[in-house]
Regions:
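Small-residue hinge/turn detector
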Residues: 30-42
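Glycosyltransferase-associated regions of secretory-pathway enzymes
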Residues: 1-29, 47-216
Length: 216
């Protein structure tokens, strides 16, 4: 890490002493991704992301970009139809004004030293410098900072009609029996698919056919 980033000493000490909290790796990975992007620019893509197509050139050229919640809440019928995954509750896909977890932090595009990514890095470093409680860390600190920055004039423009719902469509249907028509519909809505860890994978399920067997 020292070869690529000039972190303050307290960050390296927190890693060594595991005082980022119980989820040390998760919390540090948030700081790591925004620090790498602020320093070098590029694309942060978690291992849980599956790309079924190339990342569009006009998206890669953005100063800053992250997928986030659609501004308009889908109908209850649509939510019931698509949110079938056992990994989600209706509470996660929330449109309340005071709800602060609305970004997909597993895929971020940024130019080096862009205002948005630099602000995320600087605030996170300041937060961890002052945070002494090693037990009750809030899991979505990065997401909360993201929403607060938007309230203070930092902008993140959407891409076409894609939101974090479209990015999760394959995960919603992951355990269903493979349906080529459904897979085509999902690909028409999103080139990027946020997945998760699967303890078991049913043969010929959506996730088996697409990820394991490699069907296009």
């Amino acid at each position: 890490i020292k070869d690529y980033l000039d972190f303050p000493d307290f960050v390296l000490e927190k890693i060594k002493q595991k005082t980022f909290g119980e989820k040390t790796i998760v919390f540090f990975s948030d700081l790591l991704r925004v620090s790498l992007l602020a320093t070098y620019g590029g694309i942060w893509c978690d291992a849980s992301i599956f790309l079924s197509d190339k990342i569009p050139l006009n998206l890669r050229a953005r100063e800053f970009f992250a997928f986030e919640r659609a501004r308009n809440r889908p109908s209850r019928e649509k939510l019931k139809r698509i949110i079938k995954s056992p990994y989600f509750s209706y509470g996660y896909f929330n449109w309340n004004e005071d709800f602060m977890v609305k970004m997909l932090s597993s895929f971020i595009i940024a130019k080096s030293n862009s205002h948005f990514i630099s602000a995320l890095r600087d605030i996170l470093i300041n937060y961890w410098q002052k945070e002494k409680n090693i037990i009750n860390h809030y899991y979505f600190v990065l997401h909360v900072i993201f929403e607060l920055l938007k309230k203070y004039g930092y902008s993140n423009n959407t891409y076409k009609n894609m939101s974090d719902i479209e990015c999760h469509l394959l995960q919603f249907y992951a355990k269903n029996k493979f349906d080529s028509k459904l897979w085509q519909e999902i690909q028409q809505q999103s080139f990027l698919h946020k997945l998760t860890h699967f303890r078991t994978i049913k043969k010929d399920s959506m996730i088996d056919k697409i990820i394991i067997q490699g069907i296009n």
